[in-house]
């Protein structure tokens, strides 16, 4: 019997890339590949790249330098290692990667990874392969379903892509150029995916897309369904006890989504709603096509139907032309909304975007200082949000054994890690936890129906940090 070939995937960036990596694993499993944690031992290494962060390309080339040494060592050991660059950097800079990095065998954009087996065969025959065009066919129709064993191994929470691409064209963002126009999957296909996950032990589904609440996929009645109607349908699937989604655009919050938050107990009261700035002048320069007050009104609509709802967001400081007055408006918005957590970044130009051509730049010193001030405010809000849980009883969906022996860790409705001392048979259940204290960003407590037994958290990320949001909206 031929031994399985080893596959190593390193993903950068958002939840969509995590999902894409899983689907690449599923696609290549049929070709005899199994995952390995070691790039050095792999027969195939895939860098699944993100183009949002600063110096994204440089990080890819740095990693490719390390892989060149690993590939050379594999050749000396009599093994053949193939290297693939996938994702949004591949889409944006495919020709440049081929030119600069001879170690790379295949470059493939995020809309074409269902072609990986053919591209690997082409590279073996011709030396290298590049595919960064947007294919006419829907890739989801060509992707194999994950095996039952793969689903169970990935745990009780899963991502499902319902929408890809973005039509908003914010001036700072590369997503419309790397992921293409907005495309929504049919309702029936999404239901089929979620049903298969539920049948194999998944209890929590996070619906993902670059602009997920712009979803308008074809329903079984032949009409486009809004996102809220899709959520209602998925909430009816037996076994699914929690629904989440990311990432949302304020302009696409339709009444059906608000109604879903009002009506569905399975829909978690935690919304990632990026705003980027609190200054109307900067929002206009970003082509956000909403004002700060528009954003406040959207938040109010959510809160009107679900008083326990909480929000996270994204912010950019130092966008071209941002003044101290503009930045003060951002601080005012953060203060007024009150976030459970947020991501904040210094502006960095993305080649090919309109903002990259703007001349009125902000100094690095000013950006650094503003980022510290903003993050301090966000951190104080997150700390207050977490402290408010102490002394209360919260529902926790338990996910896995913690690193500390005897502990089980799960997450609250707000993605806060919660640790208790308990047996592993609670994994997959939602149980009440009495919160006794905090350790770093984690809640420590005991099962409400069991004798109190203080847990000690292993290192856990802040709210939202373990599952980075889909960037670009």
Swiss-Prot record:
Database matches in CDD domains: Radical_SAM (cd01335)
Reaction(s) catalysed (UniProt annotation): N(6)-dimethylallyladenosine(37) in tRNA + (sulfur carrier)-SH + AH2 + 2 S-adenosyl-L-methionine = 2-methylsulfanyl-N(6)-dimethylallyladenosine(37) in tRNA + (sulfur carrier)-H + 5'-deoxyadenosine + L-methionine + A + S-adenosyl-L-homocysteine + 2 H(+)
UniProt-listed Gene3D superfamilies: Methylthiotransferase, N-terminal domain (3.40.50.12160), tm_1862 like domain (3.80.30.20)
Source domain of life: Bacteria
Binding-site residues for [4Fe-4S] cluster 2, renumbered to this chain: 166, 170, 173
Co-factor: note: Binds 2 [4Fe-4S] clusters. One cluster is coordinated with 3 cysteines and an exchangeable S-adenosyl-L-methionine.
Main location: cytoplasm
Domain MTTase N-terminal: 5-125
The protein's enzyme class: transferase
Keyword presence, Metal-binding: yes
Summary of subunit composition and partner proteins: Monomer.
Function according to Swiss-Prot or TrEMBL: Catalyzes the methylthiolation of N6-(dimethylallyl)adenosine (i(6)A), leading to the formation of 2-methylthio-N6-(dimethylallyl)adenosine (ms(2)i(6)A) at position 37 in tRNAs that read codons beginning with uridine.
Membership in a protein family: Belongs to the methylthiotransferase family. MiaB subfamily.
Official protein name in the record: tRNA-2-methylthio-N(6)-dimethylallyladenosine synthase
Species whose genome carries this gene: Nitrobacter hamburgensis (strain DSM 10229 / NCIMB 13809 / X14)
UniProt gene name: miaB
């Amino acid at each position: 019997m031929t031994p399985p070939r080893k596959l190593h995937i390193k993903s950068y960036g958002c939840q969509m890339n995590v999902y894409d990596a899983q689907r690449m694993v599923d696609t290549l499993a049929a070709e005899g590949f199994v995952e390995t944690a070691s790039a050095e031992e792999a027969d195939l290494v895939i860098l699944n790249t993100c183009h949002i962060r600063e110096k994204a390309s440089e990080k890819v080339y740095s990693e490719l330098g390390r892989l060149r040494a690993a590939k050379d060592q594999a050749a000396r050991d009599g093994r053949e290692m193939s290297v693939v660059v996938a994702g949004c950097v591949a889409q944006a800079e495919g020709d440049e990667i081929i030119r600069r990095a001879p170690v790379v065998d295949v470059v493939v954009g995020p809309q074409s990874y269902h072609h990986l087996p053919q591209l690997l065969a082409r590279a073996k025959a011709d030396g290298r392969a590049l595919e960064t065009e947007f294919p006419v066919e829907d890739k989801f129709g060509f992707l194999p379903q994950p095996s039952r064993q793969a689903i169970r191994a990935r745990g009780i929470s899963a991502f499902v892509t319902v929408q890809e691409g973005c039509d908003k064209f914010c001036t700072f963002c590369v997503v419309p150029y790397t992921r293409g126009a907005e495309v929504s999957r049919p309702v029936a296909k999404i239901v089929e995916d979620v049903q298969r996950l539920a049948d194999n032990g998944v209890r929590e589904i996070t619906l993902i897309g670059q602009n997920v609440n712009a979803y308008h996929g074809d329903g079984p009645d032949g009409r486009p369904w809004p996102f809220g109607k899709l959520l209602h349908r998925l909430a009816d699937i037996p076994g699914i006890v929690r629904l989440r989604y990311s990432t949302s655009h304020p302009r696409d919050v339709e009444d059906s989504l608000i109604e879903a938050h009002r009506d569905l107990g399975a829909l978690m009261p935690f919304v990632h709603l990026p705003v980027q700035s609190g200054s109307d002048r900067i929002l206009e320069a970003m082509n956000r096509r909403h004002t700060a007050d528009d954003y406040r009104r959207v938040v109010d609509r959510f809160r009107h139907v679900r008083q326990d709802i909480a929000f996270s967001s994204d912010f950019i400081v130092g966008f071209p032309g941002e003044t101290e007055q503009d930045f003060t408006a951002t601080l005012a918005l953060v203060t007024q909304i009150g976030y459970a957590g947020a991501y904040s970044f210094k502006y960095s130009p993305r080649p090919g975007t309109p903002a990259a051509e703007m001349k009125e730049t902000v100094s690095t010193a000013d950006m650094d200082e503003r980022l510290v001030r903003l993050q301090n405010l966000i951190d104080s809000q997150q700390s207050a949000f977490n402290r408010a849980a102490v002394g209360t009883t919260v529902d926790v969906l338990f996910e896995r054994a913690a690193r500390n022996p005897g502990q089980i860790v799960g997450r609250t409705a707000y993605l806060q890690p919660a640790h208790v001392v308990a047996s592993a048979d609670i994994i997959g259940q939602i149980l009440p936890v009495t919160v006794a204290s905090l350790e770093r960003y984690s809640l420590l407590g005991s099962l409400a129906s069991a004798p109190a037994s203080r847990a000690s958290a292993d290192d856990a990320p802040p709210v939202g940090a373990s599952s980075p949001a889909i960037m670009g909206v």
